[in-house]
Amino acid sequence: MPLGEWIYDEFDYMLDHVETERRLREPLQWMPVDPVPFDARCLRDAEVIVLDGSDAMAFVRRVLELHRSGDHLRGVATTVAPVLVENHWEMTVHGDTRLEMVLTPSALEVTLDHPTAARQFSEMLEEETVYVSVSEEVPMSVGIVDETVGINLTDEQGVAKGGLVTDDETVYGWAVDLFERCRERATPVTPDDSDDLEELVT
């Protein structure tokens, strides 16, 4: 390779690294785990979603859209909202999406405390394409839609700050590993548990 071409490539690489660092500096400070469990450069092409004070629901709408964009949704969640439960209910009970989720006890409790969400959740458990389990050891909220990964960004109090969406293979591998590790330690929730779900949140 000619020296000039090598210098150009190295300079271009440096500029790409600087631009990636600048664009991701704020989002990565809200990454719920520290250090970031993969090379941050894997997120150079990620979609960055930041909570907008003028449209507080924009982030939620993007999450709903992402979850609806594929045939297979896997994930781990430390928080839920009735609108997300309704979305999953429509995707599974009234659709053919395969859903596998690991929730924290507190996330399950929020679901059960909302009458409509609790009913929809119970109906989802009856579907053969739905697998839900509960574990205390879920560190953050991550969704895997087919081969796309969505990462929720939160502050130290767990308040949502935005999210990242990426198709990067390294991030996908990390997300699948996180999901599988959490599921291995989780307690399955079955239709037979529908009358005793409260026991799983204590």
Please name every model-derived segment:
Residues M1-H17:
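Basic, amphipathic "hinge/linker" alpha-helix immediately C-terminal to the N-terminal HTH DNA-binding motif
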Residues V63-R119:
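Primarily the HKD phosphodiesterase
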Residues A107-S141:
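HKD-type phospholipase D/PLD-like phosphodiesterase module
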